Regions:
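Canonical Rossmann dinucleotide-binding motif of NAD(H)/NADP(H)-dependent dehydrogenases/reductases
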Residues: 2-34
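Substrate-binding pocket helix/loop in short-chain dehydrogenase/reductase
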Residues: 70, 98-111, 206, 210
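C-terminal substrate-recognition "lid" of short-chain dehydrogenase/reductases
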Residues: 122-125, 133, 137, 218-247, ...
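Active-site helix of classical SDR
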Residues: 125, 161, 169
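Alpha-helical segment proximal to the catalytic Tyr-Lys
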Residues: 130, 174-178, 238
Length: 254
């Protein structure tokens, strides 16, 4: 039997990049998936429906930084699937971000990164958690970053936002644990996704050095993250919460 049969998942940022792979992997393990993204996920939803059935997937276009839209997304998911068992807080600004010295980062850009990368996960948890509390179970997987463990110069907006995600995980794991809800962070290393490869500056600056820092000397791909994602979403991780799981080829020994 599929490990997530009968469960319902929301994947924010689930229409493209690494998030697309998360959506596909959850569906392949039997979960019903709501693909939620600021980009249109209907084509991916159709692809998943062909493989796993029309009742297994839905998509919604939304802005994770907008509370009203987060609330509506949760309501749509409940209307379509009846419950929410898994929340993957994946939506984030990364690929389009410029590298800037901290003295050159505009406040508007800084606030926009924080709005998407940390306010977004907060808003989703705020509106999903009551339903998980009511059913006395749930898995919240916040997507962090290996950059938090070592810092990256000229990228403080992103690194700071992901550091906040780690702190958020630790705080709410204490708050929600008594309700049977597990909250963990999955922290990828520098991953070659289709969207990531579109930013030539990031690739040029990061790819070779990322491989050099690893114990396992090769590129990281979205597929490398899926085993850990499914583990955190499944009953196999029922006694694990508040943790950061680094999937980075041994870059950071956490």
């Amino acid at each position: 039997m599929a490990r997530l049969s009968g469960r319902v998942a929301i994947v924010t940022g689930g229409a493209k990049g690494i998030g697309q792979h998360y959506s596909q992997a959850l569906a392949a393990e039997g979960a019903c998936v709501m693909i939620a993204d600021i980009a249109d996920g209907s084509a991916l939803a159709t692809e998943i429906a062909v493989k796993h059935g029309t009742n297994s997937v839905a998509s919604a276009v939304f802005d994770v930084s907008d509370e009203a839209q987060c609330k509506t997304l949760v309501e749509k998911t409940l209307t379509r699937f009846g419950k929410i068992d898994i929340l993957v807080n994946n939506a984030a600004l990364y690929v389009p971000l410029p590298t800037l010295k901290v003295t050159d980062i505009d406040v508007v850009l800084w606030d926009h990164v924080m709005a998407v990368n940390i306010r977004g996960p907060f808003l989703m948890v705020k509106h999903v958690a009551p339903h998980m509390i009511a059913q006395k179970s749930g898995k919240i997987i916040n997507i962090g970053s290996g950059t938090v463990a070592r810092g990256i110069p000229e990228f403080s907006h992103y690194v700071t936002s992901k550091g906040a995600v780690t702190a958020f995980t630790r705080a709410i794991s204490r708050e929600l644990g008594e309700h049977g809800i597990c909250v963990n962070t999955l922290a990828p290393g520098y991953t070659l996704s289709d969207t990531g490869l579109t930013n030539a500056v990031h690739v040029e600056k990061s790819r070779a050095s990322a491989v050099q820092r690893r114990a396992i000397k090769r590129d990281e791909y979205p597929e490398d993250l899926l085993g850990t994602l499914i583990f955190l979403a499944s009953s196999d991780s029922d006694f694990m919460t508040g943790q950061v799981l680094a999937v980075d080829g041994g870059t950071n020994n956490t």
